[in-house]
Amino acid sequence: MIKREISVRQQTCALLQKNLLKKWRLKRESLMEWVSSLLLLLFLYWYPHGHGATDLSSVPTKDLGRVDSFRQSGFMIGYTPVTSMTQQIMEKVAATPFMADKKVLGLLDEENIKELTESHAEIIRVIFSDTFSYHLKFQFDQRIPTSRELRDHNAHCDGLYEDVNCLIAIFWKEGFVALQAAINAAIIETTTNHSVMEELLSVSGKFMKIHPFVRQEGILTDFFIFTCIISFSPITYYVSINVARERKRMKGLMMMMGLRDPAFWLSWGLLYAGFVFIMALSLALVIKSVQFFILTSFMVVFSLFLLYGLSMITLAFLMSALVRKSVLTGLSVFLLTIFWGSLGFTSLYRYLPAPVEWTLSLFSPFAFTLGMAQLLRVDYDLNSNAPPDPASGSNLIIATNFMLVFDAFLYLALMMYFEKVLPNEYGHQHSPLFFLKSSFWLQTRKPAHVILEDGIDPVPSSGDSFEPVSPEFHGKESIRIRNISKEYKGKPNKIEALKDLTLDIYEGQITAVLGHSGAGKSTLLNILSGLSVPTKGSVTIYNNNLSEMADLENILRIAGVCPQANVQFDFLTVRENLRLFAKIRGIPPQDVEKEVQRVLLELEMKNIQNILAQNLSGGQKRKLTFGIAILGDSQIFLLDEPTAGLDPFSRHRVWNLLKERRADRVVLFSTQFMDEADILADRKVFISNGRLKCAGSSLFLKKKWGVGYHLSLQLKEVCVPENITSLVKQHIPAAKLSAEGEGKLLYTLPLETTYRFPELCQSLDSCPGLGIENYGVSMTTLNEVFLKLEGKASIDEPEVDIVGEGQTERSGDTERLMEMEQTLSSLRETEKTDGMALWRQQTCAIAKVRLLKLKHERKTLLSVLLILVVGICPFLFENISTKIRQSSYTWELSPHDYFLAPGQQPQGMLTQLLIINKTEASIDDFIHSVERQNIALEVDASGTRDGTDDPSYNGALIVSGNEKNHSFSFACNTKRLNCFPVLMDILSNGLLGMVKPSARIQTDRSTYLMDETIHPLEDLWKTAFWLILTSACPPYIAMSSVTDYKNRAWFQLRVSGLFPSAYWVGQAMVDIPLYCFVFLFMSLMDYLFRFPDTMFSIISHVIQIPCSVGYAISLIFLTYVISFISRKGKKNSGIWSLSFYIITVFSVAVILLAFDVDGTQYYIIFLIPPSTLVGCLILSLHLFIGQIFEEGQVIEPFLVFLIPFLHVFIFIFTLRCLEWKFGKKTMRKDPIFRISPRNNDVYQNPEEPEDEDEDVQMERMRTANALVSTSFDEKPVIIASCLRKEYAGKQKHCLSKKKAKIATRNVSFCVRKGEILGLLGHNGAGKSTSLKMISGDTKVTAGQVLLKGSREGDTPGFLGYCPQENALWPNLTVKEHLEIFAAVRGLRKSHAAVAITRLADALKLQDQLKSPVKTLSEGVKRKLCFVLSILGNPSILLLDEPSTGLDPEGQQQIWQAIRAIIKNTDRGALLTTHYMAEAEALCDRVAILVSGRLRCIGSIQHLKSKFGKDYLLEMKVKTLEQVEPLNTEILRLFPQASRQERYSSLMAYKLPVEAVQPLSQAFFKLEKVKQTFDLEEYSLSQSTLEQVFLELSKEQELDGLELEELDSSIKWKLLPQEEA
C-alpha cells in the first residue's frame, strides 16, 4: 500500500496547474476576461477626465472695478414684508444710480411675489426677517453660483490669453454685491440717519494672485474614479463564476478525496493574484501616463491598486461562500463594488467625519475610493491656504493601504468561518463556535485501522432473513451503521430515503447494496462518503464518528469513493485528471506518475490517456471515475454503481481489480446488475423503501428465495413438448414448466432434487425421439431473488413464482404481458390530428413549455426587471432633482466660514482677515468696530502691502483715502466662493458699528425655482433612453432555444414530429407578449411622468403602439435567428444584450449627427433593427415640428413606421432558410415553412468492405435488395446502407493536417417488421452514432438511411427515440412532459389523457406524475424517457441503452412493453445495450460492432452455435484455497477442459461437446465434485450471449487506426468456425 501524506502545498500546486490549463484551453472565456479588462484600460487612457494643472501665476491680477458699475436690466425687485421701515429702506435702494429704470415692488408675503413671477421674466426677491436681517433670493442658476462653496478640487478659475475668469466674480458682475451694498447702506442710513451709501457703492474688487493649482472637471473626474473602482470587476466576476461553479460541482467531491480547504482557495487566489498584479501594473501606468495624479509616485498608485485588487478577490471568495449560485455571486460582488465604491465619493467631498470614513473602510471599495480621494488631495492641497503637511498625507495613504490589507485578511477569515459554519451542498457544517474548541487547533489523528469490538447496539436479528456472519469476521466490523435515517424536504410531504437502517460492514469482504430504484442505496453510500448528512442515527468507520468533522476527514483520508455522478474535469485529459487526483489524495510526488500508469494499465486506458475528458464516451468517463477512486490503494472503497455504462469486458476488468484488493480492505458497492452482485460480492444487502430487508451470501439468498435450478432444453423442429414434460416430471415430480418459447423449454427444478439430475439427464440422452437438440442446467439467479423480494408484501409470506433472467417468464408475467399488450393495442386505435390542426396543437404545446420554463427562469426575469428599473431611473432622478430644486434653501453669509476668531488656533482653511491701511492716518475706530464682529485681524498699518500678492489669506480689506473720507476695496482669494459678499457684510457692519455698536447686519443668499412649463420635446431624451435600454431585453427573453438544444430537448421534439415553424411560433407566443409587457410598462411610466396633454405626446403614442408591436416581434425573431446560429455555443444572453444596446446607441448617435444627409436615417433604421423604434420616434419628432419634411411629403415618413413589420417577414424567412439548410431532419411536411422531409441523399462510401464475415456479407446484400424493392409489404422498416460517419479532428500542431475521427465504417443492416435488432459493442464502438444517423440527429458522411412509414410512400410521422442522454426539462413534471409530447405527436387531448394514465399505470409512474424531473432518481428519469419514446405508438423505435440505471423490476417492465409494442406488428425496433441479458430477452437478432465496423450479425442462437458451440462450466467456490485443488480435479475429470480467464472465485471452463457427452455422466461427475469440494453452486450450459461476447473479445489487439479514431484499441479477430 502506498503511504499517503496529504500536503496543502502539493494540492495547491496541482490545482494551480489545473487552473492554468483551464485558462489556456478555454480560450474563449479567458479572452473575454482579458478583453473586458483591456477595454476598461483603453477607456481610462482615452477618457477626457479634465484633470490637470493650471498655471495662471503670470497673468496679472484682475481689477473688477466699482461695485456700482453694475448696469444690467431685465429684472425687477420684490420685497416683503411691507412695513414703514422696509419701505424706507427699499425706496433708498431704488434711488441708487444702478437701479434706474428698475421697478421695486413691495408685496404682503412671498406668495404674492410668486404670483408676480408668473407675469415677469425675472424677479429678485428681498425677504426681510427684521430690520437688520434679510436674504436675497434669486432664481435657481441665475446671478449666483448653484453650489454653496467651492470644493478643493474644483477649477475655480480659467484663463484665456490675458483674461482670467473666476467663479467668485459672478457675485460682482451679476449684481449680488451691488444690491447687497445698496440695501446695507439703506439700512444703516434708515436706522442711524448716517449715510454710507457712497462708501459702500464705491467699493472696488480685486482677485488675489492665483498660484498654480490642480483642477478637475467635476463629473468627468468622478466618472474616471468610478471607472477605476470597477476596473477589477471583470476579474472579480470571472473569479466569482469559476470559484462558485467549481465549489458547487467539484469541491465536495474533491474534499471527499482528501482536498484541504486552503489548497482550493489558494490555487484560485494565486492565479488571480497574478492577474491582479498585471492589471494593477497596467492601471498604474495608464493613470500616470494621463497625469491623473501629478504629485503622487508610481509605486504609491500601483500599491493602492494592487491591494485593492487583492481585497476584491478575497471579497469574491467570501461572496462565493455566502451565495451558492455562480451568477448571483458575480452579480452580488459587482453590486457591492458599485454601492460601496459610490458611497466612497462622500470621502472625496468630505461629507463624512473621519471616524465614519475609517469604519466604512472595512468595505474595500469604500477604502479604495478613500485612497483615491487622499491621492487627489495631495494634488489639491496646492489649493489650500494651509501649509502642506507631507507626513500627514503619507500617513493617511499608508493607513488606507493597511485597511485594504486588513480587509483582505478579514474577508478571508470570514470566508473560512462561513465555509465551516454554513451547511455545504452536502449538509455538513461545524458548530458556530468551533474555533473555541481545542480539538480544532490541536487535532489528533486516531489510528486509521482500529476496529470497535463492541458496538453500542448490536445488529437486530430479523428472523431467518439475515445469514449469520461467519465467526472469522467477528471483530472485523469496520463500518457500523446504527439507526440511520435520512429525510428530504418535499412537497407536500417529506421523503424518507432511509428508515432506521442498522448494518455492519466487515473488513475482508466485498459487500453489495441492492434494491429497487429509489430504495436508498445511493443515499446510504453518500452518507458513508460524506456527501450527505443523516437526519438521525450514527455511523462509525474504523473508530471514527462520521458526524464529527475531524473524524470525517480521517475517514476520507483512507477512503476511495466512486460516486454515482462521474468525477472529472472536462478540460483535462485522462492522464491529467489522474495526476491531479493522485496529488490531491496525497500520493508522494515521486510516486504519482507510477501510480497513474498503474491505473491506466489496469483499466486499459493507455490508448485514451491523452484525450480530453469531455470527448470520452459515457463508459470511458465511468472508467476514469473508477480509476480516480482506486488511486493510492485506499483502505475503504465506497462505490456507487461503479460499472454503470461499461461494456462486459471492462466490467470484468473492474471485478478482478476489486477482488484482488479485497484482503484487509472494505469494499462496499451498489449496483443494479444482479449478476454483478452475484459474482463479485461475498455478502449482499437488500434495501427496500429505505429499510433493510435481508442480507447474506448468494447461496443463502438463492436457497431461501430462489426457485431452484433451471433446466433449459433447445428443441428440434419436430418435437412433442408434452412428452418431454412428462419425462421430466417422472424423475422430478416437483418440476414446473416455467416458460415455453420458440424452440425452447424451460423447467424449474427444486434445490433438494439435485441428486436426481444424473438420472434425468440419462433419460434425456437415451430418448432421441423426443426432439431434444441439447440442454443445460443452471442455478437460480439473484434477479429472481430480487423480483421475488420486491413482489412480496413481507419476507415471511408464502413463496410465489418468480421471473428468471433471459426469456424466463412466470405465469403472472404472462398475464402482465397480455395486459401490457392490451393496453398498448388499445392505444393504437387512437386517432391523431394532422395538417393545420396538428400545427396549432403543437404550437400551443411549445408555448406551454416556454411558459412553464419561464416560471423557473429567475435569471431571465431578474435581468428584465433590472432593465425596467434602470429604464425608470431617469424619470425618478428627474423627479427627485426637480423636488430638490423646488425646495428653497438659505445659506448664511458668515465671516466665520473664512476667518478665525480672536485667539482661535489656525485650522483648515480659516485665516486672519488682512486689513491694509493706506490712508496714512489712524483707522482704529474702524478696526475696533470690525474686531467686535469676533474676527481675528492682521493689520498692515503702514500700508506697504498690495493685498493681492499673498493668497495665503482668504480675503483682504484695503482702506484708502484720507482721514475723513475713506474708500474701500476688497481683495479675495479666488478659491473662496462667497468672499465678496462676506467682506461686504464685514465692511457694512464695521461702518454700522462705529455709529451703532450693538447692531449687526446679516445677509443670506437663497434661491427659488421657476414653475417651468416644460416643452414636451425636452422629455424626449427620457423616452429615447428607455427605448434604447429595452432593445437589450430580447436576448434575455428569446434565447431559450439554446438551452433546449443543449439538453437535447430540441431534437427530441423534432424526432417526435414537431414542425419547425410550430416550435418558433410557440416560443414567440410567450416571448412576444412578455416583451410587449416591457414596452407597455415603460410606456405607462413615460406617460405618467410626462405632460400628456400635448398634441405631440398623443400622436407619438398613437404612432408608437403599432410600431412598438412590430418592433417587438421583429427583435424577438431576430434573436431567434441569432440563437439558431449560435445554438452550439453558450447562451451568452448578457453579451448579446450588451451588443444590442451598444449597436442601438451608436445607431441613434449616427441618426442624430447625420440627419441632414439625405436618406441616412432611413438606411440606419432599415439596416439596424434594434435602432428602428428610436429612429422612428426621432422621425416623428421632426415630422410634427416641421423641421425637415416639406408639405406634400408626409406619406413617406409614415411608411418608415412599417419597417418593423418588414423586418418581421425578413427574419421569419431567414429562420425558415436556416431550418431548411442547417436544421435537423423533419419528420413531417411543415405547413407554414413548407419544409418537407428530405429525400435521403446517397453519398458514396470511400471504403470497400474487407474480410467480412459471411453473415455480414449476406446482410449487406439483403440491405441492397431492400433498397430497390418495390413491394411495400416486404420492405424493412429501417434500412441502413453503407453508413459511414467521420468527425473533424483536431490539429496536433499548426503545421499538421486535421485527421478525421471515424466513428462508423460501411455499416449495413435492416430491421424487418416485428423485429428487434440489437447493436452490441464495446464503449465507443459506434452504436450510439449509428442510432443518431438513423434518427437524423447526425448527418451521415456516406451511405443511406430509409425509414418506412405507415402507408406506402410515406415517411414515419415521428420516431420513438430513447437517447442515451435524458433529454428532459429539469423543472417540468412527469405529467407535463407526457402531455407535451402527446400533443406534439398528434394525440387529441382526451386520448392523450387516457394514454398517459394507462402508460403510467403500466410502467408504475403514477406516484411520480406530479414530481419535477430534477427530483427524480436516475432510474425513473430513464423510465420516463422510454415512455416518451413509445407514446403515440410510433412505427419505429430507436432505443439507446433504454434500461441503464433501472432495477430488475424496472427492466422487466420496459422489456415487457417493448415486446408488446413490436411483436406481431408492422413495427420495428433498433436497440443498443451493454446488458447481454437484455439483448437475450428482447432481440430477435443482434449485430456486434467493433471500431465502427459490423463484425457479426444473426440470431442469438445462431451466434451461440457459431461462436459458442462449447459448453460452459461455471463453479463458484467458497474460499480461494479451493481453486487449485478443484482445478486439478476438473482437469482430471475433463481432460479437454480449457480454463477461461473469468474471475477469481468464479471458475469457468470451456468444455467441448464430446467431453460432456453424455450429459448424464457429466452431471454425475459434477454432483460428486460439488459434494467433495462443498461448492456454493455450479452451472453447465451452452454459452450465453455474454459469454460469446467475452469469448470474441479475448483475442483483441491494437488496431491499425490512429488514436484519434473511436475505440481504436479494440480489434476483434473472430474465431473461425472450425476453431470454435
Curated annotation (Swiss-Prot):
<feature type="transmembrane region" description="Helical">
    <location>
        <begin position="30"/>
        <end position="50"/>
    </location>
</feature>
<feature type="transmembrane region" description="Helical">
    <location>
        <begin position="1105"/>
        <end position="1125"/>
    </location>
</feature>
<dbReference type="GO" id="GO:0010874">
    <property type="term" value="P:regulation of cholesterol efflux"/>
</dbReference>
<feature type="transmembrane region" description="Helical">
    <location>
        <begin position="352"/>
        <end position="372"/>
    </location>
</feature>
<feature type="transmembrane region" description="Helical">
    <location>
        <begin position="1069"/>
        <end position="1089"/>
    </location>
</feature>
<dbReference type="GO" id="GO:0005524">
    <property type="term" value="F:ATP binding"/>
</dbReference>
<comment type="function">
    <text>Mediates cholesterol and taurocholate efflux. Through the interaction with ABCA1 potentiates the cholesterol efflux to lipid-free APOA1, in turn regulates high-density lipoprotein cholesterol levels.</text>
</comment>
<keyword id="KW-0813">Transport</keyword>
<dbReference type="InterPro" id="IPR013525">
    <property type="entry name" value="ABC2_TM"/>
</dbReference>
<keyword id="KW-0547">Nucleotide-binding</keyword>
<feature type="transmembrane region" description="Helical">
    <location>
        <begin position="396"/>
        <end position="416"/>
    </location>
</feature>
<dbReference type="GO" id="GO:0005783">
    <property type="term" value="C:endoplasmic reticulum"/>
</dbReference>
<feature type="transmembrane region" description="Helical">
    <location>
        <begin position="1194"/>
        <end position="1214"/>
    </location>
</feature>
<keyword id="KW-1133">Transmembrane helix</keyword>
<keyword id="KW-0677">Repeat</keyword>
<dbReference type="InterPro" id="IPR003593">
    <property type="entry name" value="AAA+_ATPase"/>
</dbReference>
<feature type="glycosylation site" description="N-linked (GlcNAc...) asparagine">
    <location>
        <position position="723"/>
    </location>
</feature>
<dbReference type="InterPro" id="IPR026082">
    <property type="entry name" value="ABCA"/>
</dbReference>
<keyword id="KW-0067">ATP-binding</keyword>
<feature type="transmembrane region" description="Helical">
    <location>
        <begin position="223"/>
        <end position="243"/>
    </location>
</feature>
<feature type="domain" description="ABC transporter 1">
    <location>
        <begin position="479"/>
        <end position="714"/>
    </location>
</feature>
<dbReference type="InterPro" id="IPR027417">
    <property type="entry name" value="P-loop_NTPase"/>
</dbReference>
<feature type="transmembrane region" description="Helical">
    <location>
        <begin position="326"/>
        <end position="346"/>
    </location>
</feature>
<dbReference type="InterPro" id="IPR056264">
    <property type="entry name" value="R2_ABCA1-4-like"/>
</dbReference>
<dbReference type="InterPro" id="IPR017871">
    <property type="entry name" value="ABC_transporter-like_CS"/>
</dbReference>
<feature type="transmembrane region" description="Helical">
    <location>
        <begin position="1135"/>
        <end position="1155"/>
    </location>
</feature>
<feature type="binding site">
    <location>
        <begin position="515"/>
        <end position="522"/>
    </location>
    <ligand>
        <name>ATP 1</name>
    </ligand>
</feature>
<dbReference type="GO" id="GO:0005886">
    <property type="term" value="C:plasma membrane"/>
</dbReference>
<feature type="transmembrane region" description="Helical">
    <location>
        <begin position="267"/>
        <end position="287"/>
    </location>
</feature>
<keyword id="KW-0445">Lipid transport</keyword>
<feature type="transmembrane region" description="Helical">
    <location>
        <begin position="860"/>
        <end position="880"/>
    </location>
</feature>
<dbReference type="GO" id="GO:0008559">
    <property type="term" value="F:ABC-type xenobiotic transporter activity"/>
</dbReference>
<dbReference type="GO" id="GO:0016887">
    <property type="term" value="F:ATP hydrolysis activity"/>
</dbReference>
<protein>
    <recommendedName>
        <fullName>ABC-type organic anion transporter ABCA8B</fullName>
        <ecNumber>7.6.2.-</ecNumber>
    </recommendedName>
</protein>
<dbReference type="Pfam" id="PF23321">
    <property type="entry name" value="R1_ABCA1"/>
</dbReference>
<dbReference type="GO" id="GO:0006686">
    <property type="term" value="P:sphingomyelin biosynthetic process"/>
</dbReference>
<dbReference type="GO" id="GO:0010875">
    <property type="term" value="P:positive regulation of cholesterol efflux"/>
</dbReference>
<feature type="domain" description="ABC transporter 2">
    <location>
        <begin position="1283"/>
        <end position="1516"/>
    </location>
</feature>
<dbReference type="GO" id="GO:0005743">
    <property type="term" value="C:mitochondrial inner membrane"/>
</dbReference>
<dbReference type="GO" id="GO:0006855">
    <property type="term" value="P:xenobiotic transmembrane transport"/>
</dbReference>
<keyword id="KW-0325">Glycoprotein</keyword>
<dbReference type="GO" id="GO:0033344">
    <property type="term" value="P:cholesterol efflux"/>
</dbReference>
